[in-house]
Amino acid sequence: MLDFEKPLFEIRNKIESLKESQDKNDVDLQEEIDMLEASLERETKKIYTNLKPWDRVQIARLQERPTTLDYIPYIFDSFMELHGDRNFRDDPAMIGGIGFLNGRAVTVIGQQRGKDTKDNIYRNFGMAHPEGYRKALRLMKQAEKFNRPIFTFIDTKGAYPGKAAEERGQSESIATNLIEMASLKVPVIAIVIGEGGSGGALGIGIANKVLMLENSTYSVISPEGAAALLWKDSNLAKIAAETMKITAHDIKQLGIIDDVISEPLGGAHKDIEQQALAIKSAFVAQLDSLESLSRDEIANDRFEKFRNIGSYIE
C-alpha cells in the first residue's frame, strides 16, 4: 500500500469486514456494502486524478508494475528472444528479440526487472551491465540490416554502477549506443514504462518517437539522489521530485517526449491487458507516422529531434 492510498485501504477493510459479518451472521448488509463500494470508487477517482509527482514516483517503482516481458505477449506475436552480446555473456537485465506487430517483423528490446527477490537478483533489478547494452546494439544493427522497426521498453533505475561493469566499459557501451542509435536507418520507437533513470535509460532511448506511461518517470538522477546532492538530505526527495519535472506530463510539456499514454485507474498493474492494448495502439500510430520517410530521412529525423531538445529563444 502506498502512502496516498491509505484512505482507500481503510474503506476496503470496512467492506471486507461487512462482507465477513454478512456471511458469518446471516444478516443483510448489502446496502451498507454498496454505499461503501460507491464511496471507494469516488475516492479512488479523486486520489488518482490529483496525483503529485512523488505519488507517481511511488507508482513507477511498484514491484507489481508490469515489466517488458509482461507486455510483450499482448503486443507482439510469435516473439522469439535472442541472447548474448557475442563478446562476454548474456545479460538478463536486458532482453531482446524478434516478433510481429500486426504481421510486420520488428525488433523488441527492453530492460527487465525481476518479479520477486530471486528474480530481481537474476535480473540485477533491471540494471544492465555493458554486455546488456552491447546486446541491445547488436540487435539494433541486425534490425537495420533487415529493415525491421525497433521498439524499446525503458524500465530501469539506471545502468549498473558496480566495479565489474565499470571495468568492462559501462560508460563506453552506453556512449556507443547513443552514437549508433542516432544514425540507425529504421524507425525507432521507445516507451518509458516505469522508471527511466539516467544514461541507463538513454542507452536504449534514442528514438524517433519517445512515449511515456502517465505514471512513469524519466530523469538524470533519482529524487533521493538529487536531494542528497543539492540539499545534503535525501529525505527531501518529495520536494526534489516536484522541482525536477520528471513526470510524463511535465516532460511532454518540455518537448522531450512525444506522447503520454493513459493508465487504468490505479495504475498499469490494475489491468495489464488494457494497458498493453493502449501501448500497442500507440506503437502502431507512431510507426504509421514514420512510414512516408526514407531510410536517410528517418535517421535525420531522429538526429534533429535530439539536437533540438533543450533549445530556447531569449
Curated annotation (Swiss-Prot):
Keywords: ATP-binding, Cytoplasm, Fatty acid biosynthesis, Fatty acid metabolism, Lipid biosynthesis, Lipid metabolism, Nucleotide-binding, Transferase
Pathway(s) the chain acts in: Lipid metabolism; malonyl-CoA biosynthesis; malonyl-CoA from acetyl-CoA: step 1/1
Keyword Lipid metabolism found: yes
Any one GO molecular-function label of the UniProt entry: carboxyl- or carbamoyltransferase activity
Domain of life per record: Bacteria
InterPro entries assigned to the protein according to its UniProt record, in alphabetical order: Acetyl_CoA_COase_a_su (IPR001095), ClpP/crotonase-like_dom_sf (IPR029045), COA_CT_C (IPR011763)
Ranges where the CoA carboxyltransferase C-terminal domain occurs: 32-289
Tagged with keyword Nucleotide-binding: yes
Reactions catalysed: N(6)-carboxybiotinyl-L-lysyl-[protein] + acetyl-CoA = N(6)-biotinyl-L-lysyl-[protein] + malonyl-CoA
One GO BP annotation of this record: malonyl-CoA biosynthetic process
Pfam families (alphabetical): ACCA
Places the protein is found: Cytoplasm
Coiled-coil spans in chain: none
Complex formation: Acetyl-CoA carboxylase is a heterohexamer composed of biotin carboxyl carrier protein (AccB), biotin carboxylase (AccC) and two subunits each of ACCase subunit alpha (AccA) and ACCase subunit beta (AccD).
Function of the protein: Component of the acetyl coenzyme A carboxylase (ACC) complex. First, biotin carboxylase catalyzes the carboxylation of biotin on its carrier protein (BCCP) and then the CO(2) group is transferred by the carboxyltransferase to acetyl-CoA to form malonyl-CoA.
Family matches, as PANTHER family: ACETYL-COENZYME A CARBOXYLASE CARBOXYL TRANSFERASE SUBUNIT ALPHA, ACETYL-COENZYME A CARBOXYLASE CARBOXYL TRANSFERASE SUBUNIT ALPHA, CHLOROPLASTIC
Family: Belongs to the AccA family.
HAMAP family given in the database record: AcetylCoA_CT_alpha (MF_00823)
Protein name per the record: Acetyl-coenzyme A carboxylase carboxyl transferase subunit alpha
Top-level taxonomy: Bacteria, Bacillati, Bacillota, Bacilli, Bacillales
Encoding gene (name): accA
